[in-house]
Structures are given as C-alpha cells and as structure tokens.
Swiss-Prot record:
Name assigned to this protein: Putative 8-amino-7-oxononanoate synthase
UniProt keywords, alphabetically: Biotin biosynthesis, Pyridoxal phosphate, Transferase
NCBIfam families found in the cross-reference section: bioF (TIGR00858)
Keyword hit for Transferase: yes
C-alpha cells in the first residue's frame, strides 16, 4: 500500500527491492506453545526454530516464580534501576548470575541486545579501537558502530589474523576492545576462547564475549564457553541473555566489581530505561536455580544434538558439516534465498517448522535447526525423514 506523503514514498521502493531479492519477512502468530510442538495457523508443527534450548519457558517452577513476583511486586518495575525501579529480585538475580559465572558481580539489562549496546558504548569511544569477528551478532556490530571507535573486522574464528591486526593498529589507539560471539548464532560454531583470552592479555586489550547461545548449553553446569574450555575466571567480560536457555527475558553482563560499578554509571541502555519486570526477573532466577539442581537437562540437550547431527551426517547428499562441539544450532545450506524459502515451505507442509535464514542475516542462505532438550527421538526422526525425501541430489 502506497504511503500518503512524498517524504515516505521511498519506503515502498525499498520494500519492493526487498521483495525482489526474496529477503522480505513477516511475523507468524504461534497459537500454541512454547515447546517442541507448536500450532501455527491451526497446523501442528515440530518446532526446530526455538531458542528455548532446555525447554524451561513452560516449566512450572518458572511460571510459579513469575506469578508470585507479580502478586508481590506488580507487573512492572515502574522506574529506572537508579530511581524507583530497583527491587531485591534484581539484586538476587545479579548475585546468582555472578556466582554461576564465577565473576565478582553482574548487571541485568532489559535485553541481551541492550546489554551489548550499553556495554560497548560505555567502554570505548572515538580514540579507541574495536576488533570484531566478522560473524558477530547484530548487537555487537551495532554497538561497535555506535561507539564511535575505529572498527576492524577480523576473519571469522581466526586468532592469527586478529594478532596481525593488533600488531598493526593497537599502539595507535588509547583502548582496544575485542568482540566475539561465544557460540555463533547462525553457524553454531565456537569462538577460539583460549586464544582470544591470551591475545587480549598480550596486547593490553579488553575482551567481550557474547555467550547468549552458550549460557545454559555449554559445560556440564551450563555456565557457558568458559566452562567448556575449562578456563579460569579472568578480567574479560561475559555478556549473555536470559531469554534463550533460561526461558525468560533480559540480558546480563558479568565481570569484575569495577566493571559493573562503571556500567551502572555509564551504560545508557541500563541507566535510561525501566528495570526488568518482576516476573521476568523471578523467572530467570528460578531457571538458574533449576539448571544448577538438574544438570541432566543439559545432558539431554547434548544427546539430542548428537542424535540429529549423526542423522544429518548420514544423509550424504546434504553435505552437512558437523561442528566439533555439540552446540544446539545446526544448519544445512541452500543455493539462494528462493531455494531456502522453498525448503522451509516444504518442511512446513510436512509438519516441521524451521524458517529460512537469508541475507542480510547471513551471507549464504540456509535452514537452521535449533535443538531442544525436550525434543523426542520421534521429533528428530521426522525431520530427518522429511529431509531425506526432499533434499535434491
């Protein structure tokens, strides 16, 4: 539909370009969920598009905690955390995150995206340097752009290139911040964290790792990439989300007491927004407690990932490349966006919900499968059978 004012007619042209490139997206209403099975427009589908990796978003303990918090504190925090929006629940959650992550302190934001934006823009500015993995999440990229620092992307997962860039540019800048996903959200691979930590120390650089997809999924206790690599707690900055494996909403930064105190005074996306709602805060706290009591949920997730990855490997026509880590993100490629859309359509017709992932989100189109601990072997077998019959030689 055309816009009324000529000042806005470019929007229609832009949308037409997006449509021609097969990049157009729109939300679809889920009428039943969350869980491994959902209903979409009346159709029952096996859900391979959720980031509810441990199946906690519908867990009774989280629901009970959220309801209790609403009964006691209401539906909203009613102010910014530095004014009237700080509750004991927030402090309890931050202390629980810090203990879980092994850091001195933590700070909870309204989303993981805002945690990255606020932290990056608080730590660096025009006189500084950012070196970022080229496959980083949008929130890291946008935070780097907004900071005003000089931004250089390094080849994905390549510490050698990162080292070369630091040798060339580090001495020309006041501060340096290295940015990387922990588990990369579209590829499911893991950053070379031990090398990144060593490089950051060598070049007197800060290191921020976004562990959004590693929190709750990596390590025996689900504490993330640091536990996976069995690294000691260092000065580097751990960022993540409460909305994936923890089944709630919000984001966090975990690190030294000085870092967290500084962010309370300088992170605009924390200072100038209403605090996380009591329900979301209580649900996230309940999730951490549940994971610590029942680490077998992580074991079940890993078993499901292994089962699907083994099945995809057996379908040789997929040319599936198995990751050396059992991350819950797996994918198969498509030649172009149109083919990815066609594949997703066929999967849906056969009872599988796995939407197409296309540019500009990723450079190469694909179907991404997000594995949950609550998937049954039957759910995974159904997906493998559909792929076996559809995927062209």
């Amino acid at each position: 539909m055309a816009t009324g004012s000529t000042a806005y007619t470019w929007l229609d042209d832009a949308l037409e370009t997006i449509q021609r490139a097969h990049w157009h997206r729109h939300p679809q209403i889920i009428t039943q969920g969350p869980g491994p099975e959902i209903k979409l427009e009346g159709q029952r589908l096996v859900n391979f598009a959720s980031n509810d990796y441990l199946g906690l978003a519908s867990h009774p303990h989280l629901k009970t905690a959220a309801i209790k918090a609403i009964a006691e504190w209401g539906t909203g925090s009613t102010g910014s955390r530095l004014l009237s929006g700080h509750r004991q629940l927030h402090q309890d959650l931050e202390q629980a995150i810090a203990r879980w992550k092994g850091t001195e302190a933590a700070l909870v934001f309204s989303s993981g995206y805002l945690a990255n934006l606020g932290t990056i823009t608080a730590l660096v500015g025009k006189r500084d340097l950012i070196l970022a993995d080229e496959y980083n999440h949008s929130s890291l990229k946008r935070g780097a752009q907004l900071s005003g620092a000089k931004v250089i992307n390094y080849d994905h997962g390549c510490p050698e290139v990162l080292t070369d860039l630091l040798m060339k540019h580090r001495d020309n800048h006041r501060r340096c911040l290295i940015l990387s996903d922990g588990v990369f959200s579209m590829d499911g691979d893991l950053c070379p964290l031990p090398q990144l930590v060593a490089i950051a120390e060598e070049f007197q650089s800060m290191l921020l790792v976004d562990d959004a997809h590693g929190t709750g999924t990596m390590g025996k206790m689900g504490t993330g990439c640091r536990e996976h690599f069995q690294l000691p707690v260092g000065d580097w900055i751990q960022v993540g989300t409460l909305s994936k494996a923890l089944g709630s909403l919000g984001g966090y930064v975990a690190g030294s007491a000085s870092l967290i105190d500084f962010l309370r005074n300088r992170a605009a996306t924390w200072i100038y927004t209403t605090g996380l709602s009591p329900a979301d805060t209580a649900a996230a706290l309940a999730a951490i407690q549940l994971i610590q009591r029942e680490p077998e949920r992580i074991v079940q997730l890993q078993l499901n990932v292994d089962y699907l990855a083994t099945g995809l490997e057996s379908l040789t026509k997929l040319n599936f490349r198995r990751s050396p880590i059992n991350s819950p993100i797996l994918w198969v490629g498509a030649a172009n966006p149109a083919m990815a859309l066609e594949m997703a359509k066929h999967l849906r017709e056969q009872g599988i919900f796995a939407p197409a992932i296309r540019p500009p989100t990723v450079p190469h189109s694909r179907i991404r499968f997000s594995v949950m601990a609550t998937h049954s072997p039957g759910h995974i077998d159904q997906l493998l059978e559909v792929l076996d019959h559809y995927y062209p030689n």
